[in-house]
Regions:
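Structural motif
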Residues: 24, 52, 123-126, 160
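Phosphate-binding/switch loop-helix module in NTP-utilizing enzymes
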Residues: 88-144
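Substrate-engagement module of ASCE P-loop NTPases
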Residues: 141-167
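Phosphate-binding/switch region of NTP-binding enzymes
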Residues: 157, 164-186
Length: 186
């Protein structure tokens, strides 16, 4: 999909309701990076919200660079990074919490809960649920994501749960969709 078409389509799908909503976003691999930028831009710039960005497949600093290249102010984002600590070490960063790895669901759950409990955030982007399937059993990921969705609802937060459009992820997305308000296929 062309860049401008992708942006217009995502905005159209996310717009329309003033109510808080949680959505499953199924993304083609070739559109993945651009779609994550567009979704972040939507919440940060268009809606002017503060949010949590959980990353399981790229270090937070790579996401920061991508946002900066696209003139998106990331100062209202808090990152939960499940990559950097395992890959290359980490530093204490004010707007980032480091989780051991994508397999550490208890640690990830605690980090998400701690961030949400501050009451400072309006949305959460989960990038990507598909990566969790590489490290964890399908049923465990289903339960974890259901827990996360309930946590978002209890704090009246928006959420974007990102999936790669492949067979294994589709199986999980089909289960998770029943707990969500919106389904977007790119």
């Amino acid at each position: 999909m062309k860049s401008s078409d992708l942006k217009e389509y995502i905005r159209k799908e996310l717009d329309g309701s003033k109510e808080k909503k949680i959505g499953v976003v199924l993304i083609k691999p070739e559109d993945y990076r651009e779609a994550t930028i567009i979704i972040s831009e939507y919440f940060l710039s268009r809606l002017k919200l503060k949010g949590i960005y959980v990353t399981l497949n790229m270090p937070y600093y790579s996401i920061l660079e991508n946002l900066k290249k696209n003139d998106i102010n990331s100062s209202k984002l808090y990152f939960i990074d499940c990559v950097s600590k395992q890959a290359s070490g980490f530093k204490n960063i004010k707007n980032c919490c480091f989780v051991e790895n994508p397999e550490s669901l208890t640690e990830l759950s605690l980090a998400i809960t701690e961030a949400i409990n501050t009451g400072n955030f309006n949305f959460l982007v989960f990038d990507s649920i598909s990566t969790m399937l590489m490290y964890n059993d399908l049923k465990i990921v289903e339960r974890f994501v259901h827990y996360a969705i309930n946590k978002l609802r209890s704090y009246d937060m928006d959420g974007a749960l990102l999936f790669i459009n492949d067979e294994k992820s589709k199986e999980l997305a089909n289960v998770i969709m029943q707990f969500c308000d919106k389904f977007i296929a790119l």
